[in-house]
């Protein structure tokens, strides 16, 4: 099981840790229009899933912008940003950030994604910062559980993993 801290305090993660080589677990989250979205909806594509505690914080904002900017240069890679923010807040953030094309997904309803990927923080009911790359065959090819939730992920390694999965 991955272990993380939030501002130096140890946190409990719910669900199972996902590892490279695993079949990617399915999940159901909500799009900004409240429609359900599952992993199967992007079947056959390479997915870079960027997980953030809240889109309205500085590191989460930077992470979402960075991965969406990088993905613009990667044909065949779909970037999905998952948080427990309400879909309305995610939609507002996308409009304010000028990233209307960004795919932000909300796990607020039942933590389906958080539990399936082992990133649901029990004490805070937030998601731990993490990055997953899933290839077109639904195999997990890259995993990073960021050990301190307020730190940035390794952007370069994640982008390289997404390129390698094409």
Curated annotation (Swiss-Prot):
Belongs to the peroxiredoxin family. Tpx subfamily. Homodimer. Disulfide bonds join 60-94. It is an enzyme of class 1 (oxidoreductase). Residues 18-164 form the Thioredoxin domain. Its EC number is 1.11.1.24. It comes from Halalkalibacterium halodurans (strain ATCC BAA-125 / DSM 18197 / FERM 7344 / JCM 9153 / C-125) (Bacillus halodurans). It catalyses: a hydroperoxide + [thioredoxin]-dithiol = an alcohol + [thioredoxin]-disulfide + H2O. Thiol-specific peroxidase that catalyzes the reduction of hydrogen peroxide and organic hydroperoxides to water and alcohols, respectively. Plays a role in cell protection against oxidative stress by detoxifying peroxides. This is Thiol peroxidase. The keyword ATP-binding does not apply. Gene3D superfamilies: Glutaredoxin (3.40.30.10). One of its GO terms (molecular function) is thioredoxin peroxidase activity. SUPFAM superfamilies: Thioredoxin-like. The active site is at 60 (cysteine sulfenic acid (-soh) intermediate). CDD domains: PRX_Atyp2cys. Keywords: Antioxidant, Disulfide bond, Oxidoreductase, Peroxidase, Redox-active center. The active site is a conserved redox-active cysteine residue, the peroxidatic cysteine (C(P)), which makes the nucleophilic attack on the peroxide substrate. The peroxide oxidizes the C(P)-SH to cysteine sulfenic acid (C(P)-SOH), which then reacts with another cysteine residue, the resolving cysteine (C(R)), to form a disulfide bridge. The disulfide is subsequently reduced by an appropriate electron donor to complete the catalytic cycle. In this atypical 2-Cys peroxiredoxin, C(R) is present in the same subunit to form an intramolecular disulfide.
């Amino acid at each position: 099981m991955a272990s993380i801290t939030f501002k130096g305090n140890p946190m409990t993660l719910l669900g199972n840790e996902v590892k490279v080589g695993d079949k990617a677990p399915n999940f159901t989250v909500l799009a900004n229009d409240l429609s359900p979205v599952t992993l199967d909806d992007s079947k056959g594509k390479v997915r870079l899933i960027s997980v953030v505690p809240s889109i309205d914080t500085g590191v989460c904002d930077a992470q979402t912008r960075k991965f969406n900017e990088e993905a613009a240069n990667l044909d065949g890679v779909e970037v999905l940003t998952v948080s427990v923010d309400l879909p309305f807040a995610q939609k507002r953030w996308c409009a304010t950030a000028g990233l209307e094309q960004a795919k932000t997904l909300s796990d607020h309803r039942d933590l389906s994604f958080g539990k399936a990927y082992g990133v649901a923080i029990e004490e805070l009911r937030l998601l731990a910062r993490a990055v997953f790359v899933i290839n077109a065959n639904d195999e997990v090819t890259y995993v990073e559980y960021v050990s301190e939730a307020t730190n940035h992920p390794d952007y370069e390694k994640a982008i390289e993993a997404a390129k390698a999965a094409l």
